Amino acid sequence: MPLVEVKVFEDELTRDQTRVLIQKITDALTSVTSVKLKGVTWVIVTEVPSGNWGVGGVALGLDDVNKMIAGA
């Protein structure tokens, strides 16, 4: 039984986006393994509060990460 865990910032995804993410991850995994596993593939989406992430020894929030992505 495959298990995939995804961690995202708290409140980053809507409930609908989370549902789509779970479906697409399941589809991607079963496309390379076995369609028979679709019914037993677990996807866990864990929301991590902003500030509880760290890179290079520095605690980061969602705004910090967005700035890094934007190249600021």
For the regions a protein language model found, what residue spans apply to each?
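A domain-level signal for the structural core that forms small-molecule/cofactor-binding pockets
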Residues: 2-72
